[in-house]
Amino acid sequence: IVNPSSQGAYREAAGKYHDRLTFIEQVQVGAGYGQAILAGRDFAGGEPFLHMVGDHLCFSKTPQRCAMQLCEVASKQECMVSAVQATRESLLPEFGTIGGVRLQDLERVIEVKQVIEKPTPTQAEQELTIAGFRSGTYLCFFGMHVLMPSIFPRLEEVISKSNGPVPLTLGLQAALRRERYLGYEIDGYRYNLGVKYGLLQCQLALGLSGVDRDRILTQLIDLLSIHR
């Protein structure tokens, strides 16, 4: 889902892989994240689908990719599942956040009872605390969701009642009142490109996970010694 008139730039960036991609323009500019998801309704074709945000870089701690971890859980549980990551409260202004209960029979899976877009620390402490996590740590969105076709009428419902941009979390709130909705704590890490120093952090994470790790660490030590 892209902004109008930006399709050409994305095709150019995709290079030889552009013919594998389908671009859908979000005609209602500024209508919000929820409206962008709704624009993909026809493309989803009435099937469950994997949604990934475009400004996150994800690294798996296992040979299994992050998206595959999430899809396996959604396939087995046959319901909506959002990938989440333990996140300190200072970063709450950047992410949607869930609250709920850990499932004893399913490792890393949370039955979602509440979801709030970018909560305040006070709001998170009151409504989103999950047993087993230390104080000041919450489960925030990872940038990946497996959504069911039922998300579309939920989004239509909240958009029709709103006078401004609608985040995906409002659609998820409407959905969890009617159907099962889980969170899955991905065995990996996500980095947000869209925040201050986000690109730098992503580049460092990518470099430190590759063959030049020692070289990069040496350069970082040199920089620290210069800029003490």
Predicted segments — roles?
Residues A9-L21, V73, Q104-L106, A174-L176:
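Short, conserved catalytic or adaptor-binding loops enriched in Gly and charged residues
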Residues Q28-Y33, E89-L91, P121-A124, R190-N192:
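A short acidic, often aromatic-flanked loop/helix-cap motif at beta-alpha or helix-coil junctions
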Residues F59-H145, P149, P153:
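Conserved core of the sugar-phosphate nucleotidyltransferase
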Residues I1-H51, C58-T62:
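Conserved N-terminal catalytic core of the sugar/cofactor nucleotidyltransferase
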Residues R108, A124-R228:
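Conserved alpha/beta core of the MobA/IspD/sugar-nucleotide pyrophosphorylase nucleotidyltransferase superfamily
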Residues F23, G40, D55, I98, ...:
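Residue-level signal for inorganic ion chemistry
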Residues R20-T22, E111, R180-L182:
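Conserved beta-strand segments of alpha/beta enzyme cores
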Residues H51-G54, A83-A86, E185-I186:
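Short beta-strand segments
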